[in-house]
């Protein structure tokens, strides 16, 4: 028996590791954790303790093989084998429980609702029956997933054997009356009726007729479908046992009578199993003896059924969705019935329906929208009815209607909008009536009707604007005086006097001309229309307008006179241009976006806030966000194509004139791990000792040199070996053609060697491997070749394409061979350049020289650089005053692949910047100013740009501590290297932030900045003046000076560790067992305890453990021996303890004492 781990055993036993460990503890087996191994005897003890029987695996395998071999024999043998296999077909441990489990798979239901006693007929007619037993376990209780317990009581086995014959006889006659078959029939009927119902539902208006007419044919079809589905389900259910039945039918003549009996039972089970689900026991080891357990579905009774979804029955059903029945149905959605239906959506019925949307009925309908009926309809929009309608929106009726918009009625209309009393109704806008009509909006008395807008009726026409048959009553002078302003009293009295005389004449004319035809009304309609359209609502409602329009004839004449002038004075106002598309840059401010969209900034900010972007007027949004906002206003966006001045000025066309191309020297970079001899190799090539000047023997910044080999020039770049100079090395690889990878023969491939390989491959340069230090006794060049093969560099002699040269830089061995390989690789690359084009190259290194000012080492890549040329490198500009070669000689011109040192730049350029020679100083200065402005703008935008991600990040960084650093170095490359190395040290708790980095000595302004921002100053290869040191001391600014980067990183890491919150670990001191309890008034509960192991200190923290569960954590309030307070009590001694704020100490409790110790980080 093999050892087993706790967690694996827990999985097998379907329990948790913790529970298992508790059980092991009960039998005195102690384990450390869930990964501990249990010995075989411990396993046996555990199984015995928890009541698990473990079977022998080998024995099971042998018996299973025998079972498989015997399974091809007769049916009697098969049954015997099955009984044996039932008992011993599980390899997994099984928990034996004392609770009685009654399992009868043939009558077992998943919910347990239909578990009946054996061999008893279920009384399905009984409504509130009770089970004769309580089912306490299921067939899968306590087993692994996929296993089913097949062991059944012996009584069940005997009953199976004795009653198998009787069951066959009972099953056949009950086939037609059993509730199982009723369930099946009802299910099939449900499905068929559901299908029939769909077709009926499609016949919208004739649904009820189709249902009635087809009732007889449906019953015949349903019986046929029942039979057909019965056969199909029988076939599908019998599929798992079809193989067994076919074998039995072939062996029938050779079997005894005893063998036929179980076969018949199988057939009867198949017949009886319609409507039952089959459960196949998962047995992977013995597939030939898989058993099928038919399982009944819940029985549905046939008396007073409760309707279910898509369930159709014929006796008093409760209607459901899509349910059609003929006896007292309750109508549902799309339900069409003929007896007392309740109408629904699109429901058309003839007997007392309740009308719905688009519902047309003839018997007492309740009208809805667009509903037209003839008997008591409820009027709708534009609906005209004649019998007691109940008015709705825009409803027109003939009996006491309320007039609405475009409403035409003939009997006592009541005005709505601006409505006055019902005995003096007003007409409405566009309201035409023929009985007692009144004027419109702004209407006067009913005995003086006004003509209406667009009103054309033949009965009692109403006069129009300026019509002489108007019956205008005599105005009341006192009312007019109160109504009008005092400034116009005199004029209005005069108007009233004139109007009084005219009113008499108008009354007389109205009586004479009352029966005029309607043609005059039509002709007189237009002037009023013009007046109304030209006046605003407030002007029409004003008293001045009423007076001038209806009382003052002079005003009318003036108005008529002015009409000609109005026609002349009206100016044509062109319609506003609709904004359909805008062109915007890659990013723009909210203000610019608002101006582009012709919207206010507030509207744009609201839209952005709706998308979760909190922005102000000057915040930038990108093109995608601006596009989304523009689409909100239906405006399309196009990205502006920005052609920069640099693109116009600089000649970056890749197409070159082949006739002007000339061969150029190869640019070779030396790469490799720290101390593998890169600078020594370059020194051997140059035959000059440059390594002595490097601090600590480590190259700190790039040097560029030209050497002659076989009368041909080769330019070498020496990149630093330390990983902190990754960016510088990457820049070096970008400008080179060939990379010499230096690998020490004794060390082999190191981390930075791999990094150098990746950079060289990324730059797509040819790699030549120089295996250095072959003069050492421990050198193993073959090992180096093998290691390089893992990274895709295979030596030529091994079938690859990589050139590998073993060299010794110290003893100058094979140096010439290495140079020859470099020239060979250069010839294969066919390196050429045009020396007559505009000069272009890369800044290799730049520094600030005290005597000469900004000095830049540049590598010309194309064209010829001459003294006096104007240069642009990034945001710096200068005119070349002098050029020096790598040997220190002053030169006038430098062609392609030649490194030179130039003077005359206004600032120190960034290392790795591309430089261009320009012809005009003005253009160059303009470009530099533009670039500087862009840099400042980008720095400002970087802090103010708002996105959701930034917002959440800032919230999360509320507890982040910043370590501010100011870096000053001798060259720009070192500033970048130190900055990147230190920022890599940032973690979740401390963030390293370089607030300033520059080339040059440390100044007093740097100290001031450090004091204000609480920063550390790091100087790299620079020294501060005496005044700066004094200022730093007075300001208490930490200033550190380094010449090697390793020490700078170590010191900063130490500073960060000091800022980190300390971490603590728990150290257990000892355990105390409470043996007696004393309750002291005023003090609380004191426990008389015994120190079982370790020791207990007075200031230690304690944990009260009761029966393995921690119930309290706190501190000791007191620790005493007899009556004396003591600092600590050792193992084997008794003591009295009390715990702060805890008095629930009981006998048998274990108190665990511990202290928290700080962990160094």
UniProtKB/Swiss-Prot annotation:
The keyword GTP-binding applies. InterPro entries: EF-G-like_DII (IPR053905), IF2_II (IPR044145), IF2_N (IPR006847), P-loop_NTPase (IPR027417), Small_GTP-bd (IPR005225), T_Tr_GTP-bd_dom (IPR000795), TF_IF2_bacterial-like (IPR000178), TIF_IF2 (IPR015760). Residues 213-224, 239-259, 276-287, 305-432 have a biased composition (Polar residues). It comes from the Bacteria. Residues 718-721 are annotated as: G3. Keywords: Cytoplasm, GTP-binding, Initiation factor, Nucleotide-binding, Protein biosynthesis. GTP binds at residues 672-679, 718-722, 772-775. It is found in: Cytoplasm. Residues 772-775 are annotated as: G4. HAMAP family: IF_2_B. One of the essential components for the initiation of protein synthesis. Protects formylmethionyl-tRNA from spontaneous hydrolysis and promotes its binding to the 30S ribosomal subunits. Also involved in the hydrolysis of GTP during the formation of the 70S ribosomal complex. PANTHER family: TR-TYPE G DOMAIN-CONTAINING PROTEIN (PTHR43381:SF5), TRANSLATION INITIATION FACTOR IF-2-RELATED (PTHR43381). This is Translation initiation factor IF-2. It comes from Ruminiclostridium cellulolyticum (strain ATCC 35319 / DSM 5812 / JCM 6584 / H10) (Clostridium cellulolyticum).
